[in-house]
Regions:
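Domain-level signal for Mg2+-assisted phosphodiester chemistry and nucleotide/NA-binding surfaces
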Residues: 2-126, 176
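Nuclease catalytic cores that cleave nucleic-acid phosphodiester bonds
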Residues: 104-246
Length: 246
């Protein structure tokens, strides 16, 4: 049983169940790259920063065919441990995603990566995201084996996930795999192993799927879109409606 695009509970077995798997940082950095392209590295375009406040359940719903229904959206990310502003923005966004009934957040972690400075030779430590690829691969394969979906939509441009897709095709050949590439992300390997025509996520899809500027949680404090992500007016969809309803 799942929620259809009109917000109704559906038991229609003729609908093909879809789980969407979103590589959070691959999507984020794809949008950030576009913001830099349209502005500068020091001053990225604010019109693209606003898409960081993204309604991923609505986006996943927009990728469906009429014969499909959205069963779940799995969002893979890692908690930021440095930079107060970055932490506050991420926390606000994750709180917003937690209000969406079909979204599940799955965490990896950041690990310090030691590198020597090219100029002075002194060691420097940069955070390196860990476990995201493994988490996506594990969920993709296990969900296929447990018959949790008919079609898996994978939002990423990371070719490290090719072996996981190959495993799904080998173990459950009846499952359909679809790749949806974030902005500025593409992999011939991913497109080839999935088969079929990949989806390209660009501005029209992002523009129509911004979260509301204010999300009311009744007993909990309201969630306010961070100033950096406010950009210009975006989605005006009332949040008490199903975000998949257009």
């Amino acid at each position: 049983m799942s929620i259809d695009r009109n917000g109704e509970m559906s038991t229609d077995q003729k609908k093909f169940r879809v789980i969407t798997y979103i590589d959070g940082y691959n999507l984020y950095f794809g949008m950030l790259a576009e913001a830099v392209k349209r502005g500068t590295r020091d001053e990225p375009s604010p019109s693209w920063y606003r898409y960081m406040w993204l309604d991923i359940q609505g986006l996943a719903g927009d990728l469906l065919l009429p014969s499909q229904e959205l069963a779940k959206v799995k969002y893979f990310t890692s908690p930021i441990s440095t930079g107060k502003g970055k932490q506050e923005r991420q926390n606000a966004y994750l709180d917003a995603l937690r209000t969406q009934p079909l979204v599940e957040i799955i965490f990896g972690r950041f690990q310090p990566d030691r590198k020597e400075c090219d100029k002075c030779g002194h060691p420097a430590y940069h955070p390196q995201e860990k476990k995201t690829d493994v988490n996506i691969a594990t969920n993709l394969i296990c969900d296929a084996l447990e018959d949790q979906y008919d079609t898996a939509v994978l939002v990423t441009g990371d070719s490290d996930l090719v072996p996981a897709l190959e495993a799904v095709k080998r173990l459950t050949p009846q499952k359909r795999l679809v790749i949806a590439f974030p902005p500025n992300r593409y992999s011939d390997e991913l497109a080839g192993v999935a088969g079929g025509k990949p989806i390209r996520i660009w501005e029209p899809l992002l523009r129509r799927n911004r979260l509301p500027a204010l999300i009311n949680r009744q007993a909990l404090p309201d969630i306010v879109c961070p100033a950096k992500y406010s950009g210009a007016p975006g989605c005006t969809r009332p949040f008490n409606q199903n975000p998949l309803a257009k």
